[in-house]
Amino acid sequence: MDLAKGEWRDKSPDRILFGKSSLSPTLRQHLALQITYREKIARKYPSLSSLFLPEGITYEQSSGEATARYKAETFAPSPFLVDGTGGLGIDFSHLARGAQRAIYLERNEDFATAAQYNIPRIMGESYSPARIEIQQGSLLDELERLVQNGMEMLYFDPARRAQGGARTYALADTEPSPIEVCHTLQRLDYQGRILIKVSPMEDIKEVLRQLPSVGEVHIVQSSDEVKELLLYIPTLSTQSEATPPSLIAVQLSPEGLVVNRFCGTPAEESEHPHHFASALGHYLLLPGAALQKSGLFHSIGITYNAIPLHPNSHIYTTDQKPSHFLGKCYEVVRVIPAKSSELKRLNQVYPEADFSQRNFPLKPVDFYKKTKIRPGSSHRLIGTTLLSGESVIIEAH
């Protein structure tokens, strides 16, 4: 039964809850919740409008279809996959398509019950009850059994809310703790792979310090935002055995295809010389969110044959336009000193403009107020600071 369609499609949650109906109070509550979530479901899961969302699901933490497809393309297949924090089942359903055997494990009974309804609908023809198992239980409690049964890949997405409901981003405070899970698996002599989804707010350096076995950090950008950090552990190791990790920044299309990709390592970053531009080239490069999150700012310059303008600007310049850049590339038209006298008459040349800034004394709202320029798309202006300390406004297109 699709609760968000049919005769209930155009009714408000309040009318469903309090209007006349033959539905039971329990079913009314479930139906009102589905109607409330309907627009969010359509936006985040455009091909999955019939999903049933149980009350209490951490909707904002659930993966979208694009990032779920990326995980499946990058880390599948597996002979025996376990999703230890099943949740809504989006990631599980995509990863399980390439698995010979797959277990969805969820500690919350309502979520596990909803998964019985959702997963066959998400997986479609690739769903097979002979190889797909939906179980209720705690990952930490079940680890020993799963390892003994031959688990080859473990995926989990720790809850980022403390018991009181407040958000938490520290690895040790998420549930289950990736640190505790990895320690337990080491004790059990687990030889398989691990994939952990953590908050985009995590400090990558701190994560690598706490989890030395991480071989790859995937920084996944979709719709100009970093949506996920994925920690890939090909095999558990000690601090002394660990190999230098790779940081992989990717930009996804709405369909989950990789549009742009960048790869570097903290070890390489420390070896690159620190050069800064003395003058602007023909093009201006503004790294996207995933590139910025990597923190590999000198490696970015080497990869794209570009030079940063300033240590704190994270804007690059080059005379050669890169064929594939994970960010925005503009042609430099004009450079204007950000002096008070110039700002006062700027609206005579640019009555309307789209203004953005990095390492610039004026925020956009203050810039528009001071210059009396109207926000719009007629011109593109970028405020920044050069290595000399001079603040400038760059017209670009």
List PLM regions with ranges.
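SAM-dependent transferase fold signal centered on methyltransferase-like domains
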Residues: 1-397
